[in-house]
Amino acid sequence: MRILRGSPALSEFRVNKLLELCRELSLPVTGIYAEFAHFADVTAELDASEVQKLEKLLTYGPTIEEHEPEGLLLLTTPRPGTISPWSSKSTDIAHNCGLDKIARLERGTAFYIERSEELSELQLIELKAILHDRMMEVVFTDFESASALFAVSEPAPYTEVDLLTGGRKALEDANVTLGLALAEDEIDYLLESFTEKLERNPTDIELMMFAQANSEHCRHKIFNADWTIDGVKQEKSLFKMIKNTFEVTPDNVLSAYKDNAAVMTGSEVGRFFPDPETRQYNYHQEKTHILMKVETHNHPTAISPWPGASTGSGGEIRDEGATGIGGKPKAGLVAFSVSNLKIPNFVQPWETDFGKPSRIVTALDIMLEGPLGGAAFNNEFGRPNLLGYFRTYEEKVNSHAGEEVRGYHKPIMLAGGLGNIRDEHVQKKEIPVGASLIVLGGPAMNIGLGGGAASSMDSGSSSEDLDFASVQRENPEMERRCQEVIDRCWQLGDANPIAFIHDVGAGGISNALPELVDDGERGGIFNLRDVPNDEPGMSPLEIWCNESQERYVMAVADKDMATFDAICKRERAPYAVVGKATEERELKLEDSHFDNTPIDMPMDILLGKTPKMHRDAKTLKANNPAIDRSGIEMNEAVDRVLRLPTVAEKTFLITIGDRSVTGLVARDQMVGPWQVPVANCAVTAASYDSYHGEAMSLGERTPVALLDFGASARLAVGEAITNIAATNIGDIKHIKLSANWMSPAGHPGEDAGLYEAVKAVGEELCPALGLTIPVGKDSMSMKTKWEENGEQKEVTSPLSLVITAFARVEDVRKTITPQLRTPDNLEGLGDTSLVLIDLGNGKNRLGATALAQVYKQLGDKPADVDNAAQLKGFYEGVQALVANDQVVAYHDKGDGGLFVTLAEMAFAGHCGVNANIEALGEDTLAALFNEELGAVIQVRNDDLDAVLSTLAANGLEACSHVIGSVEASDELVIKSGESVVIERNRTELRTIWAETTHKMQGLRDNPACADQEHEAKKDNSDPGLNVKLSFDVNEDIAAPFINTGAKPKMAILREQGVNSHVEMAAAFDRAGFEATDIHMSDILTGQAVLEEYNGLVACGGFSYGDVLGAGEGWAKSVLFNDSTRDQFENFFKREDTFSLGVCNGCQMLSNLRDLIPGAEYWPRFVRNESERFEARFSLVEVQKSDSVFFNGMEGSRMPIAVSHGEGRVEVRDNDHLNAIENSGTVALRYVDNHGNPTQQYPNNPNGSPNAITGLTTTDGRVTIMMPHPERVFRTVANSWSPEGWGENGAWMRMFQNARKNIG
């Protein structure tokens, strides 16, 4: 083992946060210094040149002054016996750089602890706990101990459970020790199956496989159970009531209840992808259907939030990719419900500390870490995250089960999304006998063991070690490679080699492989030692049942194996043939190492007629008093509700997630010139050549279930509809729903409540509306139990139904946002009015509202959907208005009620509101804070009569009220008649609304950046995003050259982990280039030669997952490979070529500066000042330079998509910065909304000196930039754009310039 020192690992503010934690724990720590330590496992001694190459490879990241370490050494490393994602990616880079003697690289962090006195044993344990994550790391006290990272253990054998002599007791003991979560009747079933049918003892691996495959998590036993309620046998199971929605309204559903995701009818559009033979990008006109799936990952997120949420998103993405015979994930959502945050020094009046068990983390930690995990996976995979919700609830209430603490100690972590699939690929094919059964993706590791069974238990029912063992680890860059393989397969059309595919999720391959062959009506014979395995010491049970992520299983016919193998090699996606499909429905697993057969059983024992569950439930009704108003004052109520996290601004959850990748995002969360996160729904374009698209929205009103189960379920459906109504869908039958049910099954009253809620939507509301629920998920163990000081405690979740609505969109340009408009920012607007559509019909019920929660109350009667026909009329009326362009702004009424709706619209519009609520009743508190369904729309007064007439025609006349007007002011004034009810300054309210996001950012990110962003929100003079162009955006200067028919050749270059290549190809294609897909593996293997191309673009993403520095690993694979280096150097020297590097490609090309003429002053790009991935829509100004891309654009100011974690320009010193400025190579700078270059965050999202974000060479042929012009080349893909732009956005001009430059 060779040990190499790395760069410092922690910035000053990260060190300060650790020291603060030490002070809180009263540890005598006076200083901390941390640096990376690298460990190389070599197969032979490295020569001097190889050592030099390795040292250069491991020099990356920000240049921080080195520190000669002193103090106590605590070395954190990945757990011995595991291989971290960092290790696998950095080892890949080393091999691609020719360092073949390196078997493996690994990285640790060396902490040097200075202390005022020696640490006691207990203090040392506490210190280690804050320095490492016990889920995946260990702590050593010397470097030599790290050799354990490369130790190889001997394989462990399987064990038998002796039922033949030990009987039922032996199985009961195994149930506990292995954490199988078997029910009593399942124990009986297994006992009978093995002792009477098979007449042998089971192996531990067979029992674990059975437990995973038949867990509540995988088999949904409660939803398939027979029910008796209050002594009356019920006719239908829960699942049958859900399926009733499909029986009543099967319209537009192509696949339901049988695959990894549901499929609905999409649009016919031109899908843009490379031709499988020529690799040239083209449009392919075809039916492009819509995938939809929403998962939960609650249990792992409670134990370890980052990996729990990250693998939750990763698993849902795999579900979409594994639909039919290959789907394409497109846009995601992430949502959370947790208990009260109790932010330090910001604890709110309604937040009581009810305690928690030690095995789970706090709600605050979940929300500091979990969203980062979910965002990081989506970011690195390359899927925009466009939707979410965030609810906090934890209160002692008197509901149907009496007084108890209800809340989300077991959180909800929701991960979902939509994708696309070809018409001919919706249904899976037949598995041929003898087909190869394949595992595609990463290796087996001893992680995530028993996750399916563990998540099926109430939190606290299993041992703590089993809880920790059941959490997985993530490697999104590996999943991206696997998806590229799936993409290449479906792009082959009828020649798609995939016959059958499933993702690997709960239960690992022990669930996925049996499911694969069973669904394909086959059996399978497998060899355990063919499963790719990074931990040779694992037992057969651990190899077969672990939940290592980023894996798919599939069947490929022998005739298609050569095609499949070539695709995998090109994409560098590992795969293994682990078995063959058999005619006999038997499952056999052979182990060549021990020469035995750990599994040999008929499929019908594993997945056959296991005992059916029966639920006997009793109805309990809540009887709670109305809200006590005596302590509620209007202005204080306003402040409290705006601070409730469910209502408050969510920016800290949004800007961490890429919202522009694909270039197909038509509506993200951020709205208008001030980028306020209040969008009603998410919208994507179906293609680059049309305005058809897809939309998704969320609906949930879970606290209502504490008063009325059915109402909570109906409101969830209703809210999803009032949200998605903001876009142009048409017939309601184009909307399909996912229903995610979370319940504390078995808790008093909850089972009957669950049945009532499912019946309310499945048998009643959805059929009445014409809505179908073709997909969903259930999580039936939403309770946390623990013992504290000898007292039994529990926190029980409310029944929680989360509805996600998905829809085909006719025209994405017609999507309406909540941004109020005034004549000064919308030409020809004229006078406007605000209209409230109140589907509560004046009932104004306050039960289980945000208002009730912030006063620690529940109330009696909640909002409800009293009239399904009226809700349908609302949808149809709003759709008519949207289609006719008669709505200026739209916002649904939800958490916080009418007051919050009006406030959020004013925030988005940076304006005032003058409203009068006299028509809503005398009870102004109830009128403003009830959460009945509805919406507020802004309409032109010229259209007002027509709008009211349309609403009346849809049965909404009695509930539609003109309540006020929009004012070009900073005041929110609400009156009732002549009495002023609320008169508040908008900026002041906006600041209060932002406090939660500010506090959370300050705890999680660089607090200086958090403070700057919060201060900026107080600036009422901020003009918002604006545009100043030196050219006509609607002129196509490339058209004359395109008309000649000549198409210059453009190399669209990607490396493993790059994810922005398709939109880049689309931009160059539109400008008249012949865009060709080139993978770095094509260049390294000689399949592609750069000299054939006129232009080269290095695309954005996460090459090698950004290990060894963003873009640096990619660059070093060029620099350290002589033939590849020569090819790039020769290309850059050719005077008839041009090159562009964007984001990751910018970072990569900046590291090739020695090969690029005129780039000698280029800087490096390192970690953002905020130390956080930044996804922003930032204003930049084009500088005077010779860049071929920016010819004629000098002085133009326009917003652009920014998405990076390492975009800060790093210079050696001031002389270097001056040399850059004096060379005339600065091409782009960040500017504030007044047009001035800025260092202020977030206008300068990464802290780059002199606001530099784009550079060119002295001759202008090579340009690099961190922002993403390719994602916003269409107007519709801009989060905000001014009126008057046509199809092309302003950034299309730089691609047209490139074409014009060639002539």
Swiss-Prot record:
Q: Does the keyword Translocase apply?
A: no
Q: Where in the cell is it found?
A: Cytoplasm
Name the predominant localization.
Answer: cytoplasm
Give binding positions for ATP.
308-319, 679
Task: List the catalytic residues.
Answer: 1143, 1268, 1270
Q: Where is this region: Disordered?
A: 1003-1023
Entry keywords, A to Z: ATP-binding, Cytoplasm, Glutamine amidotransferase, Ligase, Magnesium, Metal-binding, Nucleotide-binding, Purine biosynthesis
GO terms assigned for molecular function = ATP binding; metal ion binding; phosphoribosylformylglycinamidine synthase activity
Positions bound to Mg(2+): 719, 723, 892
Q: Which PROSITE patterns match?
A: GATASE_TYPE_1
EC annotation from Swiss-Prot or TrEMBL: 6.3.5.3
Q: Hey, which pathway is this one from?
A: Purine metabolism; IMP biosynthesis via de novo pathway; 5-amino-1-(5-phospho-D-ribosyl)imidazole from N(2)-formyl-N(1)-(5-phospho-D-ribosyl)glycinamide: step 1/2
Annotated Gene Ontology cellular component terms: cytoplasm
In what ranges is there compositional bias, type Basic and acidic residues?
Answer: 1011-1021
| Cystine pairs | none
Quote the InterPro entries the UniProt record gives: Class_I_gatase-like, FGAR-AT_N, FGAR-AT_PurM_N-like, PurL_large, PurL_linker, PurM-like_C_dom, PurM-like_C_sf, PurM-like_N_sf
Q: Which GO terms describe its biological process?
A: 'de novo' IMP biosynthetic process
Chemical reaction(s) catalysed: N(2)-formyl-N(1)-(5-phospho-beta-D-ribosyl)glycinamide + L-glutamine + ATP + H2O = 2-formamido-N(1)-(5-O-phospho-beta-D-ribosyl)acetamidine + L-glutamate + ADP + phosphate + H(+)
Q: Where is the Glutamine amidotransferase type-1 domain?
A: 1050-1303
Q: What's this protein's family per the entry? A: In the N-terminal section; belongs to the FGAMS family.
According to the record's subunit comment, the protein's assembly and interactions are:
Monomer.
Q: What is this protein called?
A: Phosphoribosylformylglycinamidine synthase
Q: Which organism is it from?
A: Aliivibrio fischeri (strain ATCC 700601 / ES114)
